[in-house]
Amino acid sequence: MKPLDDPQHDREVGSRDSTLDTTRIDDVRIGAVRPLITPALLQERVPVRADTLALVEGSRAAIAAVLHGRDDRLVIVVGPCSIHDHDQAIEYALRLKVVAAELQDDLLVVMRAYFEKPRTTVGWKGYINDPHLDGSFAINEGLERARKLLLELTLLGVPTGTEFLDLLSPQFIAELVAWGAIGARTTESQSHRQLASGLSCPVGFKNGTDGSIQVAADAILAACAPHAFMGMTKMGVAAIFETRGNDDCHVILRGGKTPNCDDAGVAASCAVLRAAGLPEQVMVDVSHGNSGKRHEQQIVIALSLIHISEPTRRS
């Protein structure tokens, strides 16, 4: 039996180019259609025990406690830009776990486990989309690898955070995620705001690529509200989802045309949140626009944040 990701498997009526039917006016730019594993089947292949889910639930509750001022620790999301190798991710997690335990009285450490990469133009779109990094787009395998890694990280006792980019991928992995992010390119997207309103984990919205904080504040207000939208169930059936809203959302300052990670940037961001009637809680991204994409600047920025006044530096 051919695997689901076999390039010759079940493309519409069996032909690789069956969708290129010149007599039709629909799907004329679709080169091929392959089957996608259902979330329910993947959950059956990679099951999660109740005690494992309890670890995720506890991590989410701890992060929410920080966001709502019931815990005075700082939430720190740290890790590689994106996941591309399972074994390297596990090795990193084992080292991070040791440091996180040492700092647990002051910091709530979450490991960054990003499987999807938004691109400004084109490029590798992440571990789920192309797990072999060769353009084979073995998406079913990528989903399974991502789920297995999240499960293993959780079993190690390491909470994970990821960016939700594709609107279907949360159905495959979200119950193993302690904290989620909506990126700068999608914060203004209505679909992603609706998605965040139904996610079970705390969610951070990045400011816009131009540095706009208002975009992120608007996103939080939208995510706090109930929504109804189309989606896919765990059984792979199209459905209408009605959400209750997510009040565990916050802003991520990632810079824009200029950095916004200093005292003035944080204060200005808090002013926008205050005007919107939102909690003045921000997380600072020490990379991207704040670092000028120079990794050596990340430590400098992190150290500078220590000196920001206590009421404005909680994340």
Report each predicted region and the residues it spans.
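Active-site-facing alpha/beta catalytic cores
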Residues: 21-26, 106-261, 265-266, 289, ...
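Metallocofactor- and cofactor-centric catalytic cores in central/energy metabolism, strongly enriched
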Residues: 56-64, 71, 81-84, 88-93, ...
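Acidic (Asp/Glu)-rich catalytic clusters
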Residues: 67-68, 101-104, 152-157, 273-277
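Single conserved hydrophobic/aromatic residue that forms the stacking wall/gate
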Residues: 306-315
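Polybasic, low-complexity association/targeting segments
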Residues: 12-34
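N- or domain-start disorder-to-order transition segments that initiate the globular core
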Residues: 30-67
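Conserved, mostly hydrophobic/aromatic
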Residues: 79, 284
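Glycine-rich anion/phosphate-binding loops
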Residues: 84-101, 136-148, 303
